[in-house]
Regions:
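SAM-dependent Rossmann-like transferase core, predominantly class I methyltransferases
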Residues: 1-15
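Conserved class I S-adenosyl-L-methionine
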Residues: 13-23
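Conserved SAM-binding loop of SAM-dependent methyltransferases across substrates and taxa
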Residues: 24-36
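Conserved SAM-binding motif I beta-strand of class I
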Residues: 37-43
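S-adenosyl-L-methionine
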Residues: 44-90
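Mobile active-site "lid"/loop adjacent to the S-adenosyl-L-methionine
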Residues: 86-117
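Helix-to-beta-strand junctions that scaffold the AdoMet/dcAdoMet cofactor pocket
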Residues: 122-124
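C-terminal catalytic and target-recognition region of SAM-dependent MTase-like enzymes
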Residues: 127-187
Length: 187
């Protein structure tokens, strides 16, 4: 994922960033180091607390950023209802997860629904960082799911930067390319 992080260094100062499925808040820390104000959302209190520690370890004040515990789909709806918008939305879900509110999430079948739920929160001209390590989701299917969600939301993709699997994630015959990452600018 390191190949994607430097993109936060351009244009992140003063940006509002939503990191859904934040885990230990790696994307949030990188965005905050570049001057963004972040909102980290995750279903695990344990990992959000770890994320707060990562902010502190990186000389960032975690109290200047938001950490939201709860179901991502539920919170995407809540934030949209409150008309919250972000300059950058990061979607890097686990391949599989389960919550009481939303039930089962599988990246292979639900990535498009995730993008559809997140797009109302993305400002016009904003950037969507979409990533998955779901081996069963082919790159063309991943991009098609995102494109279908954008079209349904009447959001034109004006720029696309696909990041191939980096060298620190070796590709072998037994383990083909599974990491897919794309940066999209949407009108």
């Amino acid at each position: 994922m390191s190949a994607g992080f430097p993109l936060f260094e351009r244009g992140a100062a003063g940006a509002e960033v939503l990191n859904a499925f934040a885990y230990t808040c790696g994307f949030s820390v990188c965005a905050a180091k570049a001057g963004a104000r972040t909102t980290s959302l995750d279903l695990s209190k344990k990992y959000l607390e770890w994320g707060r520690r990562n902010f502190t370890l990186n000389a960032l004040d975690p109290t200047a950023h938001d950490f939201i515990y709860g179901d991502v789909f539920d919170w995407l709806r809540r934030l949209a209802k409150k008309r919250r918008v972000f300059d950058i939305v990061v979607l890097d879900p686990p391949t599989f997860s389960q919550s009481k509110e939303h039930g089962l999430f599988r990246a292979e079948k639900d990535y498009g629904a995730l993008v559809a739920a997140a797009l109302p929160l993305l400002k016009a001209g904003g950037t969507l960082l979409a990533s998955t390590n779901a081996a069963g989701l082919k790159p063309e299917e991943f991009l098609a799911a995102i494109g279908t969600a954008a079209t349904a939301a009447r959001r034109a993709i004006t720029q696309r930067h696909y990041v191939p699997q980096p060298p620190d994630f070796p590709i072998t015959r037994d383990e083909p390319a599974y990491l897919k990452t794309v940066w999209l600018k949407l009108a």
